[in-house]
Amino acid sequence: MQDFKVAISNCLKEKIEDLSKEEIEALIEVPPNKDMGDYAFPCFKLAKVFRKAPNMIASELAESIEPSGEITKVIQLGGYVNFFVNKSQLAETVIKKVLDEKENYGHSDFGKDKTVIVEYSSPNIAKPFHIGHIRTTVIGNALYKIYDSQGYKTIRINHLGDYGTQFGKLIVAFKKWGEKEVVESNPIPELLKLYVRFHDEAEQHPEMEDEARAWFNKLENGDEEAQELWQWFRNESLKEFNRVYKLLDIEFDSLAGESFYSDKMNRVIELLEEKNLLKESKGARIVDLEEYKMPPALITKNDGSTLYMTRDLAAAIYRKETYDFDKCIYVVGSQQNLHFQQWFKVIELMGYDWAKDLIHVGFGMVALEEGTMSTRKGRVVFLEDALNQAIDKTKEIILAKNPNAKNVDEISKQVGVGAVVFQELSNSRIKDYTFSWERTLSFDGETGPYVQYTHARCCAVLRKAEVEVTSDIDYSLLADEDSAEVLRVIESFNKNILLALKKNEPHIVTRFMLDLAQAFNKFYHDNPILVENLEIRKARLALVLATKQTLENSLKLLGMHAPERM
């Protein structure tokens, strides 16, 4: 979008023959403090070439560059050459681009003709969709939208945990203590009670574990009763999951879970045998990874049943053959790091060069304020309850501020759910954190509602404008520092999206949104917009519209709504 970096790299290229224009442009940074200028070029890489200290090189370069056109001032700060740009041109470039591209502002064709799979959410059938699932669900959805916005063909997969020995346990528990009508009245909580009861009873009667394994083997071998019960557990669970996905406005392209690969695992075992990778170990079959300082990868148990590893290998091969992906991203908690390292290594040892395109996007664990979560003991906060409580709390706040507010239910849902989503995405994903109702639902400080309120504020100003807002304005009226700060942030939108994409870190976008909201609110506080002077009013309204559009685009990028009134 921006000609400033190009203009700066053109100036520098005349002085630096040893770097290409593209290399120079790639090195240009934005200084941490606006008093240091709009852009900075680091000279450390040139020290060996010029055989001088970086600050001396920076000083000589700064003195040799004459300000002109886009660049109004050039100074040396330490080992950097710092550039101040023409604020009127900055305003014109940014505002024209935003108002021209509208909802596509920030988008690019960076990933054109490339395919990315994002696997996320992936709850276990017949187990609670709890607050611990919020992270994979919203991080994955944000990554899907980020990649999609940059031109990738992006496929959303919900790899349901609909297979495994837990179904043997559930079948045993249901046959002993379950009632169909009771389960159908409240599926997940009732199935959870059965699952927890199985574990309590099995502590006293270990033979129940053998019974559960036998039922799972029956399921693997196509036993009719086992298959019917499994399908029923799956259908009832999906009804509950879909209510949560509807609250979050999340959809998937595929719900092919573990069971989908049950008939594709023999091929994996045959391929492993062909490559001489399988070894016997205490009756089980493994891939030995000692050479790579990892424990063995378990492929089949001693009773012949398969494991997560087998199904994950089958899924990866199927996806490569079906979608021919350039990247396959797995949004799964960091406690699974070893599993992913083993599995990616096995794919590599099988001779697949696309092993390098498998990416584990890990994230920290969620704990409750009163302790960690455990399905086996039944101590869990249901995600649907968390979202509904957020909506109810938001409704109370809105009605307390404005008892006559319209569309309260719709706005409460958009803001309440948005508060939870933003909270989940506002820190580096790798950090562990403790779930707190008070912090999540706080409407002060660096929160989702603060960003949404800033968007609604822009909309309110534009409704009162009484003039058509266009890009046909006097841009010199936006050359002040408050306006320039807003424009600098808006200009960095695509750069931040691409950085979030390259690091698979949605919190880079939440930080961008907060920076923009804070810069705009300072501008709004210090610069009256609906003034009598028509030229000033039109210029400032154009800035408001550009801010509103950019906030709306960034909120949507994270799976949040942009309410026009709050």
From Swiss-Prot:
Molecular function as annotated in GO: arginine-tRNA ligase activity; ATP binding
Positions of short motif 'HIGH' region: 123-133
Assigned keywords, A-Z: Aminoacyl-tRNA synthetase, ATP-binding, Cytoplasm, Ligase, Nucleotide-binding, Protein biosynthesis
Primary location class: cytoplasm
Range of residues in the leader sequence: none
Reactions it catalyzes: tRNA(Arg) + L-arginine + ATP = L-arginyl-tRNA(Arg) + AMP + diphosphate
InterPro entries, per the entry: aa-tRNA-synth_I_CS, Arg-tRNA-ligase, Arg-tRNA-synth_N, Arg-tRNA-synth_N_sf, ArgRS_core, DALR_anticod-bd, Rossmann-like_a/b/a_fold, tRNAsynth_Ia_anticodon-bd
Gene Ontology cellular-component annotations: cytoplasm
PANTHER family for this protein: ARGININE--TRNA LIGASE, CYTOPLASMIC, ARGINYL-TRNA SYNTHETASE
Protein's name in the database: Arginine--tRNA ligase
Organism of this sequence: Clostridioides difficile (strain 630) (Peptoclostridium difficile)
Organism lineage: Bacteria, Bacillati, Bacillota, Clostridia, Peptostreptococcales
Gene: argS
